[in-house]
């Protein structure tokens, strides 16, 4: 059978949790097989900051994300076409997913305006006026040649209310039809529509229903993890997975905190992406089950342990916390070493969840993970509620009060995550 007869995406559920909505799957793409649930590191401009493709292969990364907005500006469509696509351009043999570019323009550019035609914005490089239409977004993504590509959607701030939310949802549906019409490589690239609707349950349901009428191979859930409360966040995820078809992959955009990943897998999500692992590495922070280690802190000066004794990444095999503390305060190379570890951590977390689902031990995995992650404080109420909604019960812990400012530690942790979310959104 020739390559043109191989479906560009097939998805099979290989195991399901008997309690929650978690499932393990196998997604077969043009360039590689991808085991789900999966975390996709973000290579904004065709590379992860501080990590080369060979290192990603060593970490057994099966799929990464490329940013259409940045790649469309630099190196540009002509360069990508001449190179034969992003895979050849960056020397990456495995799968790539590309976003549409809409989120970056609306969230990062002050002068972006949206109308029915598309997104009008000024280039950050030369201040020239630019227009990104659904058709142009698809043209760029066809040139990039990713295995999975996203429709251009009408993005509004998550906390927006009123008629603008419905307008954006309806426009997103109209735009997916324009994207499908413009898609010139359906035989080897799979286009995902994006579920929008803000924090409005009926709008989310309407959007899912409309998008399911289109002939697509998977679905993305957008417009979340952008400042809404965690209670609203998990409820919208739960609503979407409750209506999306079970035989196609579900991608939750822009989510990367470890606890969020575990909860959303329980709610039925298969795919995730976020810049968080590499961005937090540039601040000298390493990811572990209990949260983050800020290796710039003096307490690590004489700590001769690896970041995580259970991690087999090259950073943990070779370097101590003491050494990483030393270079974190002096050398930029530390961000590369920490990025390797942080990506390895995210990939290992996803692998552990897959294996637990396949053994039908996912609820116990969740309980054990949350006990480690919130070792010194109560599990936040939103996590208990979200897991309870899919029949995973966690014990309610007593609130512990920080004597310094009398704030519950859960509230202080949430403030820290808010800062991290702002950093992620600005990257």
Curated annotation (Swiss-Prot):
Residues 254-260, 278-282 are annotated as: RNA binding. It comes from the Eukaryota. Its cofactor is Zn(2+). Substrate binds at residues 99-103, 153, 196, 223. Signal peptide: none annotated. HAMAP family: Q_tRNA_Tgt (MF_00168). NCBIfam families: Q_tRNA_tgt, tgt_general. Belongs to the queuine tRNA-ribosyltransferase family. This is Queuine tRNA-ribosyltransferase catalytic subunit.
């Amino acid at each position: 059978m020739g390559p043109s007869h191989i479906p560009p995406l097939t998805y099979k559920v290989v195991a399901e949790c008997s309690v929650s909505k978690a499932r393990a799957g196998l997604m077969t793409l043009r360039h590689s097989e991808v085991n789900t649930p999966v975390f996709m590191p973000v290579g904004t401009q065709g590379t992860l900051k501080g990590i080369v493709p060979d290192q990603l292969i060593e970490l057994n990364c099966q799929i990464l994300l490329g940013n259409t907005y940045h790649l469309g500006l630099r190196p540009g469509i002509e360069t990508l076409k001449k190179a034969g696509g992003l895979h050849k351009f960056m020397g990456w043999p495995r799968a790539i997913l590309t976003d549409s570019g809409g989120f970056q323009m609306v969230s990062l550019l002050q002068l972006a305006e949206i109308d029915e035609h598309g997104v009008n914005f000024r280039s950050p490089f030369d201040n020239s006026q630019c227009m990104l239409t659904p058709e142009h977004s698809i043209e760029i993504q066809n040139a990039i040649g990713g295995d999975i590509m996203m429709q251009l959607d009408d993005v509004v701030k998550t906390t927006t209310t009123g008629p603008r939310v419905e307008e954006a949802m309806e426009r997103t549906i109209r735009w997916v039809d324009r994207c499908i019409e413009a898609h010139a490589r359906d035989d080897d690239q799979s286009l995902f529509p994006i579920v929008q609707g803000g924090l409005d349950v009926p709008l989310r349901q309407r959007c899912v229903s409309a998008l399911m009428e289109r002939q697509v191979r998977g679905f993305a859930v957008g417009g979340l993890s952008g400042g809404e409360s965690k209670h609203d966040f998990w409820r919208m995820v739960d609503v979407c997975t409750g209506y999306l078809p079970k035989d196609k992959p579900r991608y939750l955009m822009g989510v990367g905190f470890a606890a969020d990943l575990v909860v959303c897998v329980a709610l039925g999500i298969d795919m995730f992406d976020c810049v968080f692992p590499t961005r937090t590495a540039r601040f000298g922070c390493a990811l572990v089950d209990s949260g983050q280690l800020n290796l710039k802190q003096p307490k690590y000066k004489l700590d001769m342990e690896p970041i995580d004794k259970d991690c087999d990444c090259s950073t943990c095999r070779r370097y101590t916390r003491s050494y990483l503390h030393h270079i974190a305060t002096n050398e930029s190379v530390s961000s590369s070493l920490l990025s390797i570890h942080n990506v390895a951590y995210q990939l290992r977390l996803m692998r552990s969840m897959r294996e637990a689902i396949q053994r039908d031990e996912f609820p116990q995995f969740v309980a054990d993970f949350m006990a480690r992650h919130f070792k010194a404080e109560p599990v936040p109420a939103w996590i208990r509620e979200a897991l309870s909604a899919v029949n995973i019960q966690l014990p309610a812990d007593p609130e512990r009060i920080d004597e310094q400012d009398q704030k519950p530690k859960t509230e202080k942790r949430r403030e820290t995550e808010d800062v991290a979310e702002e950093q992620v959104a600005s990257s």
